[in-house]
Amino acid sequence: LPAIAACLLSIPAFGATSDLTVNGSAKIFTGPGGGPVILLTPAQQGQAGSVFTTSSIVFDSTYTFATFFQFKMTDPGYYGASDGMTFVLQTEGASALGANGGDLGYAGITPSVAVEFDTWQNPFDINDNHVAILTNGQMNDLDPKTPYGVTNCQPSTGVFGCMSNGDTWSVWIDYDGTNLRVAIADNSTTRPADLMSYPIDIASILGQSSAFVGFTAGTGAGFENHVIANWIFH
């Protein structure tokens, strides 16, 4: 398939799901507002799902981009809310998908760069409510491993500041060719101060001028719905 030359995507404007490739447990459906909504995993045990652009996106030499999306993590299981989701740039292909559980549907996808939104503490995690940068399908977080305000989020239903609290969260991710910046807000569309800014050479990691862009998520013994809406990428 040809690469998308104009580096601009707006999920609400998509008229056909052919613009996105859906893998594993993921589905695309019409939300309450009439626009497309991505369900990466249902609230069931042992799920893994991903959604990527069907065609690769052509970047400039520095991989400069900005993206905004909203997510909700709802209906946590008896063992707790788990496991989380990632936003990913990768060159493996539109059908890329890793394992479930703590692998978040991301482990093993390489070459790649991801921003992780993690809601379950595995042995390699700092806590059960953090954001991190991942590369090349490896789940050992790069620095900074940044907790978001609240820790010990099990169970987290209704707890402000826990990413799995069922609220609508807004996410801004920007890359200027040198620093990857991430900001998130609970129940707000006003951008706060950056949660993290991390120096990283995405062009060198991916090794080519185009990449597939999208999301992954996973559940284990614990589970939750992982839902994405209002995604804009440019």
PLM regions: where:
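Sec-dependent, cleavable N-terminal signal peptides
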Residues: 1-15
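Polar, low-complexity loop segments and adjacent catalytic/binding residues used for recognizing
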Residues: 11-234
